[in-house]
Amino acid sequence: MENIKMEMIYFAAAIMLGMAAVGAAIGISLLGGKFLEGAARQPDLMPILRTNFFIVMGLVDAIPMIVVGMALYLIFGVAA
């Protein structure tokens, strides 16, 4: 019974990491596409758009880093 619990914890951590990676990839690709679209429409607003792009990209990329920390806690803290 203990092995099943450990396997489920490892499986949950793997699902967390996979979904975080997919979510970040989709979010950053959508953000990059909208950035290029906005830069093509308004070239004079490029510096403002670039600043906003990097701020929001950092926020989008922060969520998978939090999930990595949670998954590592599950693997090494709870399952150990």
Swiss-Prot record:
Cysteine pairings via disulfide bonds: none
Membrane topology recorded in Swiss-Prot or TrEMBL: Multi-pass membrane protein
Residues flagged as site, Reversibly protonated during proton transport: 61
CDD domains per UniProt: ATP-synt_Fo_c_ATPE
Superkingdom of origin organism: Bacteria
Transmembrane portions of the chain: 8-28, 55-75
Keywords annotated in UniProt: ATP synthesis, Cell inner membrane, Cell membrane, CF(0), Hydrogen ion transport, Ion transport, Lipid-binding, Membrane, Transmembrane, Transmembrane helix, Transport
Record's subcellular location: Cell inner membrane
GO cellular component: plasma membrane; proton-transporting ATP synthase complex; proton-transporting two-sector ATPase complex, proton-transporting domain
Subunit structure: F-type ATPases have 2 components, F(1) - the catalytic core - and F(0) - the membrane proton channel. F(1) has five subunits: alpha(3), beta(3), gamma(1), delta(1), epsilon(1). F(0) has three main subunits: a(1), b(2) and c(10-14). The alpha and beta chains form an alternating ring which encloses part of the gamma chain. F(1) is attached to F(0) by a central stalk formed by the gamma and epsilon chains, while a peripheral stalk is formed by the delta and b chains.
Physiological role: F(1)F(0) ATP synthase produces ATP from ADP in the presence of a proton or sodium gradient. F-type ATPases consist of two structural domains, F(1) containing the extramembraneous catalytic core and F(0) containing the membrane proton channel, linked together by a central stalk and a peripheral stalk. During catalysis, ATP synthesis in the catalytic domain of F(1) is coupled via a rotary mechanism of the central stalk subunits to proton translocation.
UniProt family annotation: Belongs to the ATPase C chain family.
Name of protein: ATP synthase subunit c
Organism: Aeromonas salmonicida (strain A449)
Gene behind the chain: atpE
